[in-house]
UniProtKB/Swiss-Prot annotation:
It comes from Synechococcus sp. (strain CC9311). Keywords: Aminoacyl-tRNA synthetase, ATP-binding, Cytoplasm, Ligase, Nucleotide-binding, Protein biosynthesis. Homodimer. It is an enzyme of class 6 (ligase). Belongs to the class-II aminoacyl-tRNA synthetase family. ProS type 1 subfamily. The gene is proS. This is Proline--tRNA ligase. GO terms for cellular component: cytosol.
Amino acid sequence: MRVSRLMLVTLRDVPADAEIASQQLLIRGGFIRRVGSGIYAYLPLMWRVLQRVMRIVREEMNQIGALETLLPQLQPAELWEKSGRWQGYTAGEGIMFHLEDRQERSLGLGPTHEEVITELASDLLRSYRQLPVTLYQIQSKFRDEIRPRFGLMRGREFIMKDAYSFHGDEGDLARMYEEMEKAYTRVFQRCGLTAVGVDADSGAIGGAASQEFMVTADAGEDLILISPDGDYAANQEKAVSIAPPALPLPSGESRVISTPGQVTIDELCSAQSLHPSQVVKVLLLLAKLESGDEQPVLVCLRGDQELNEVKLVNALTQQLDSPVLDLSPINADQVKTQGLQPLPLGSIGPDLSDHSLAGARSWKERFYKLADTTAAELERFVCGANTSNEHRWGASWSDLGTIPAMDLRNAKAGDHCVHRPEQSLEERRGIEVGHIFQLGRKYSLSMGAQITTKEGKQEHLWMGCYGIGISRLAQAAVEQHHDDAGIIWPLSIAPFQVIVVVANVQDEVQMALGEEIYNELLASGIDVLLDDRGERAGVKFKDADLIGIPWRVVVGRAAAEGNVELVKRSERDANVLSRAEAISSLLEAIPTELRIQL
């Protein structure tokens, strides 16, 4: 390929709306262009990168026996209603684009395909003899993101590989889950990425077990916690830890103290000479459920800990037998709208009476109370007295009443590891590029997907699902591999492996040597780009650095002696070599398996 025919348009200035380095470089390098909020066009260079990523993914999926298919992007609402997820994905999280056709039938643009694939399995899989089977596809997905950002990292349309496996028993599902974990590890290694597998929350997809694959990068949206020995890693949403011990409250009789203007933990601790671990703070939240109920929730936390909303939502969904569509703090205006007397916000204690909800217009008239274990373990503490500007000093659970306790706090860096308490968790940022789930029977039960067992019984299928964000992975590679001058593509996914830069195309000797090297590399199966533009040499060199081709051959003044410069993009040191030496070096550096099959 010649640059003069590539439609390459690069930018010198950083786009104003590009927030992170990888997004800036992909736009500046002519890889992508923004079409709308969260919507990007993949230009020729980017499409070549994506094709290379997809090829690696396909090879690894095929290697473990998965079968490629293509499922419809438009999905009937009744399938999602059957699984119980339509309301949550349209009215709850609201991430599914949905529409009505001219017959007023509701349809959704698929953010995921569990419903479609389970419906197909219910129709096509009848006997244990057909199992196990794994199907996968690579196609565009859609999410109505509230705030699209970071280019391809969080867009409203993106390319994804999703796979679904079906099994006759839980053990076989666990075997495939392990196989898929190994395949994902190989995918990321082959793509030149440093990725770590972490325990993760199953989210709206559900299931018994799940693992995320995170590319470590400072720009990552996810916080991951890792043990120094590498034996434990988890997304903060899922992470568990041992919190530092609380400082004991000084002895003394239980009493009510005046705390005017001391609404926050910091204000209270500063005024009363307390440590936050000596305080139990109370959060009032409103959970809106798929069932239509509006449930007030009272949560108790130790003052030095933060609420993990994912853990709380999971607990409420399980205990209230209805998915939580929304969880938000209760404020004074909401209390007034419900026709209730003002609550002493900032001075609320764990024993706040349900009488304060009596006569609520739409809320349940009883608090659902939960406590984090670190709060429940305190023997004596300070908490709100349920009267404005007053707190209890020396309160105890025996006086206030027992509240069900569970892990509801955010684990954080510095906490002790559960598996080895002598170690402390460390913090990293990560970009999620893959996620695997053991779904169990969640979808087969709701959608009636059964097979006949060897014993002649009808049993519901066991399922797994496995996703890789293809377009996100490509940008994550840039986030991990770049410098001040531009992108440094890993060789395996680079749009081209070599770029031949002719410094002066008007010089016949330079141009002739450039063409010879270009053609010889092509004949050897090297994917090579020839910069034959009539631009100044400096412009070409800057563009070559920006677009990040792994190897550069510079044909300049030394062409008269038959010499060229060979530059590795990741090192940028130039070596003067003869034409034959340069070609020999490139053939040695680029493995046969990465070359074009001629």
